[in-house]
Every structure is written in structure tokens, then in C-alpha cells.
Amino acid sequence: KVLITDREFHTVIEAALALLEHPPLVVDVDDPEYGEGRAVSALDYEALLAEGDPEFAWEWPDDEWQAISLNYTSGTTGNPKGVVYHHRGAYLNALGNQMTWAMGHRPVYLWTLPMFHCNGWCYPWTITALAGVHVFLRRVDPQKILNLIRDEQVTHLCGAPIVLNALVNMPEAAKAAIEHPVQAMVAGAAPPAKVIGAVEEMGIHVTHTYGLTEVYGPVTVCAWHDEWNELSLEERARIKSRQGVRYPTLDGLMVADPQTLEPVARDGNTLGEIFMRGNTVMKGYLKNPEATAEAFRGGWFHTGDLAVWHADGYVEIKDRLKDIIISGGENISTIEVEDTLYKHPAVLEAAVVARPDEKWGETPCAYVTLKAGFEGTREADIIAFCREHLAGFKLPKTVVFSELPKTSTGKIQKYL
């Protein structure tokens, strides 16, 4: 076992090592851009590489089903699980990325997506196989992202919608630095239509995908049709917010009744759960056979995401199964309410959760982070704005102004 770390984490690493009777080999990466902290080990990463034998006879896996890595779910539900990846799924999804995004040779890829998240959606392998350039970023900083796009001629980047939201809220002079086309792949909660439109105006083409840790990252894509380019910006943004169709490397995708597994009607209205199966689905959860069996009940992987199926085969998520609000017997999509909140000129970030209510059972409660200069915005202002765009029963009954807790990948932690 080898632990590779750097100065930023020296405090927690030293504390962890002190608890071990037999600590593993520790290797330090000395990042010149991070001058604080101290080295934990006397062995430097570059020195370790210099000790290597270029003629070493590597042992290849006996079969493609062998485990290649262990990734933990992000914990947005408060219960992270260890997801075991296999070699076949990893290389197939790496190929799926290239095919789906039509990436040519030698792309310049900016790591706005953490590499530890679903193995960086398999892009460490995709970009390397295409002889591309990896441009690394220690943390998401919108000004630095814009600078690197310009200076390194970045062609591709990935991440959660919050990354795009940070870019569109930069000063106009900073955004003007983008002078060449940039491809951005986003996943997670659907980007608000307003954000997609603003990013397009910056010269960044957004491809919306969807996936989970259990399926190696993105496995569906909102594949774009040329005729959609003739639509209005608002209509294009609405279409781009859909999660789309399956990757060519995913065997099966359906929206179905979570109990019977019967596919729902492709009418764009009937709710069901998204199910997947194929070679780009995990082996299972580490040392958790009960959770694995439940996740694959009926021979399909249960995502826990509620969606509708459109007539053209495109999937559109409406909410997490655990996030849907049931108020007076009516289902309320938190995503729909959040999308409305993002249209308010004062709202920087928003999350909607269920709040217990004696009369209705549950009502929507909105947590909102305001943009700089809009500190005078009141709860009544937000609710009045929503009333112009939503049915009465969907309105937030409570608005809380605060910073929103996030995971290390930028996802909002609603369960907190």
C-alpha cells in the first residue's frame, strides 16, 4: 500500500499515520504552486519515479472483470458507499467519452472536475489515449479558469453546473477573455436555463450529461440535433437541460415504475425511475451485499432519480426519488422550483427541500445565496417572483438566506 499526498494535507495525514501501528509507504508530491505546509515523507514523488525500472514486466489483469479502482459516492444523501469499478467498464466509458463528445486528437483538457470523482469521469484515460494535454487546477477559481482557458487554449472542461454558474457571474471584462470555442460537459443537477443561455453567450458550448458514481460518471448525453440551432435561446436552453439518451457503451436505459419495472409511457409527463444496465455499471458496493442486491433488484441498476421519457427517447430528470416533495397529495419537483429561483436576478445559488407542515404534510423551503449587491432582497420578494412563474401549491412557503453546504465536487448537500 502506498499513500501519495502533498503539503496541503499534512495535518490530517500526520494525525492519521499516528494512529497506525504499521503505516504504509508515504510519498510526497511537492506542488510548486502550494508553498504552505510541510512534507510528510522524505520520499518525493519525482524521486520515486526515478527509481523505477522501464523494463519492468507488468502483470496485466487476468480478465476484464477484475477491480481497477474504488470510488465512494459523494454523500449528498449522507450515506456514502464504496463503489467497485472493473477494467472493462473503465476503458469502455473512456471510449464512450471520446465517441459522445466527438473529441479529436490532442485536446487540451482543464481539470475543473476533481479527478477523484468517479475517476474523473474516466477522462484521465480518455485524454491520455488521445495524446491530449491535462491542465490541472488545485481548486475551482473562476478567474483562474478564465485565465487558463485563454493562456493554455483549453478546448474542453467538465464539472458540476456550479462551475458554469461561477463563470457567468464574473465581470464582463473577465468573461471577454474567451476568444475561441470551448466545450463544456456538465452533469449533476440540470443547469438552470438562465445559466445555459449565459454560458452560450460567452462562447462555451454546453453538453449536458448524466450519470452516477455507480456507472463510471456520465452514461447519457443530450445529443444535439442541428435543427435545434434554429430555435430561440430559451428553447435551446430548455432542451439542453434534458439528460438525453444513452452512451453507445451503455447497454440499457429506461424510465420505469420503481416497483414493477414496467417502462412508463414516452409522453414527457409520466414519472418513473431511471434504470440502467450494461458493462459500464459497477461490480457492486464494497463489503455491502445487501445494498448491492437492492441496487440491482430485477436485473437493472436503480438510480433513485425520477424522470419522464419524451417521445424522441430523451430522458429528463424531474427530481431525486428522495427529494420529491409531496404537498397535499401533489408531487412537487424541487428541480422545477430551483430552476425558477435561478431566474431571479438576485439569486446566486438555490436549493429546495421539504419542510414538515401540519396542514399539507410537506411544503417547499428554499435556501438561497444572494449575489453581491443584492443583500436587501427579502423573503417576500423571492416568493412574489416565484408566484409569477409557478402554480400556487409549488411556491416556497419559507425562504432562508445562507451559504449552501457543498460536497468536494461542488454538489449542494441537501441532507444537511
Predicted feature residues:
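Structural core segment of the AMP-binding/adenylate-forming
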Residues: 1-47, 372
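Conserved beta-loop-beta connector loops within the AMP-binding
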Residues: 246-275, 311-312, 373-379, 413
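Conserved AMP-binding A3 loop
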Residues: 68-92, 414
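AMP-binding/adenylate-forming catalytic core of the ANL superfamily
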Residues: 1-7, 149, 157, 278, ...
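Conserved AMP-binding/adenylation subdomain of ANL enzymes
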Residues: 91-108, 116-156, 170
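Conserved pre-ATP/AMP-binding loop-to-beta segment of ANL
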Residues: 27-28, 33, 40-43, 50-72, ...
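ATP-dependent adenylate-forming carboxylate-activation enzymes
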Residues: 7-12, 112, 132-152, 161-162, ...
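Gly/Ser/Thr-rich phosphate-binding loop
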Residues: 46, 129, 154-159, 168-238, ...
